[in-house]
Regions:
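H-loop (His-switch) and adjacent beta-strand-loop-beta switch element
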Residues: 129-142
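H-loop/switch region of ABC-family ATPase nucleotide-binding domains
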Residues: 116-117
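Conserved ABC ATPase signature
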Residues: 56-60, 64
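Helix N-cap at the start of a conserved alpha-helix in ABC-type nucleotide-binding domains
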Residues: 92-94
């Protein structure tokens, strides 16, 4: 979730936020099992959050908070993960930790969908890219998606014929 939708004054600790990612499985008022606690500890370790596990979320830096939110999403045993701008406004160290975890999940056969607008590192991070501009413009290998021709066709020379059709139908001329 975007930070604007999070009440940072809510009195909740890092480990509690992360565990809330599996409440659908365990229920709101039940204690986490050994399995969930093991997964929590693994995520805390992988994303280097263990030393702040008992800290209130209001005390976290932007990168720490983003790592907590990614860990929360990863608490579920999903086959598909959708992450909305996980690298926005964070330090390079947090970005690298999150990307390392994402790559690990991908190697485990998980599908990771990421909304990402900064193309500068896309070739390092993603093996396939979907380009959108009003509609699907391209889906395929990163190298092809990032070609000058493809990017120009999608974002510079893009023409939405449906908008032209709509405006000509609404015209009184």
């Amino acid at each position: 979730p975007q930070k604007a939708h999070i009440d940072l004054d809510f009195p909740i600790k890092v480990d509690q936020v992360i565990l809330s990612g599996c409440y659908e499985d365990i229920g709101w008022f039940k204690k986490a099992s050994v399995v969930e606690k093991t997964k929590l500890n693994q995520l805390l370790n992988d994303l280097e959050l263990d030393h702040i596990r008992h800290r209130q979320i209001a005390e976290l830096s932007g990168g720490q908070l983003q790592r907590v939110l990614v860990a929360r999403a990863l608490m579920s045993n999903s086959d598909i993960y959708c992450l909305d701008e996980p690298f926005v406004g964070i330090d390079i160290y947090s970005e690298q930790l999150i990307m390392k975890k994402i790559k690990h999940l991908r190697h485990m056969g998980k599908l990771i969908l990421i909304v990402h607008h900064d193309l500068s590192k896309a070739d390092q991070y993603f093996d396939r890219i979907l380009l959108l501009n009003q509609s699907l413009q391209f889906l395929g290998p990163t190298k092809e998606a990032l070609s000058s021709e493809r990017l120009n066709a999608t974002f510079i020379n893009y023409k939405d014929d449906s908008l032209l059709t709509l405006s000509s139908q609404g015209s009184t001329n």
